[in-house]
Every structure is written in structure tokens, then in C-alpha cells.
Regions:
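Beta-propeller-forming repeat regions
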Residues: 1-167
Length: 167
């Protein structure tokens, strides 16, 4: 039986350019300024072949600094569509402002707090496609998510938090 390949690698330069174009388009669609989008930043972009089909899915965490008081976060799972181009199959955009930062230190967002980050991929439910495991760091704990390919779409199937009072 065919199993998830476990391939995990850096994207090629061509893959990175294609993904960055998608990310820029999404940020512009969300109202982020063109100048902020030009200075695109990221925490992670990983190529993972989740189903051993020879086509890498891309899991990424990008952000932009729209202003001194606004960060724009984007987590996504992208895969090639029928025309051979990458498209977001799952994406979540979030705008963060200083009033949402519990510590009062807005630079914590730039260091990864509130960003959804890839932990790993693992095939665990027998469907021959690896699930994607992520972490969202917070000030009073972390959120853990699992994504699975369901009915042809990436879907969050698990969400849990560990909580400890920090303030």
C-alpha cells in the first residue's frame, strides 16, 4: 500500500517565488499596503509530500508589517492545482494590533507569538495522507492544531490549548 512519503525539504527557488506571489496577492486582498507586501517576512516555508504523489505541498507562515501598530499574519497549506500552479487549499489571515498583545510588548509578535507554525507531518489515521501538525504560541500557553485532507480539502480536525496564567 502507498504510504505518505515523509519528504520534508526547503522549497526550490522557483517554488518559493510562486508561493511568495500567492502570499503577496492574499495580503493585498486583505488590505495590506503594497509597500508592506514588498517587505514580506516569514517564519517558515516547508515543502512536504504528504501523500507520496511526487508533488510537494507547501506549508508556510508569513507576515507583513502594515504599520508600526499592525502586523498581518498568514498561515497556509498550498498545493498544486490541475493546471500545475500552487494555490492555497487552506489559509488563515489574522491582523494583530498592540491592544491584542497581552504583554504590552508588540515586538513579541515579530518573534513568533500568535503565528501558526509547522511542527511536523505524520500519517496517523490510515488514509495514506500525512496530517499536518502546527503550534500557535501565546502568552499564557500554546495552541496545537492538526490538519487533515477531508473531502478534497485541508481541514482543521483537532484544536487544543494548554493554558497557564502568565499575568
Amino acid at each position: 500500500s502507498k504510504m505518505a512519503s515523509g519528504v520534508r525539504r526547503l522549497p526550490t527557488p522557483a517554488e518559493r517565488r510562486e508561493i511568495e506571489d500567492l502570499v503577496r496577492e492574499e495580503f493585498i486582498r486583505q488590505g495590506v499596503s503594497a509597500s508592506a507586501v514588498e517587505k514580506l517576512k516569514y517564519h517558515n516555508l516547508t515543502a512536504i509530500d504528504v501523500n507520496a504523489d511526487g508533488q510537494a505541498e507547501m506549508v508556510g507562515t508569513f507576515w507583513a508589517e502594515n504599520s508600526a501598530n499592525e502586523r498581518n499574519l498568514l498561515f497556509f497549506i498550498a498545493e498544486k492545482n490541475k493546471s500545475g500552479k500552487y494555490a492555497f487549499d487552506y489559509s488563515e489571515y489574522r491582523k494583530v494590533t498592540p491592544d491584542q498583545v497581552m504583554s504590552g510588548d508588540f515586538t513579541e509578535v515579530d518573534k513568533g507569538v500568535y503565528h501558526e507554525l509547522l511542527l511536523d507531518s505524520l500519517e496517523y489515521d490510515g488514509d495514506q495522507t500525512a496530517e499536518i501538525f502546527t503550534l500557535v504560541r501565546g502568552f499564557e500557553g500554546n495552541n496545537f492544531n492538526v490538519y487533515s485532507k477531508r473531502n478534497g480539502r485541508w481541514t482543521r480536525i483537532f484544536e487544543r490549548s494548554n493554558y497557564h496564567c502568565a499575568y
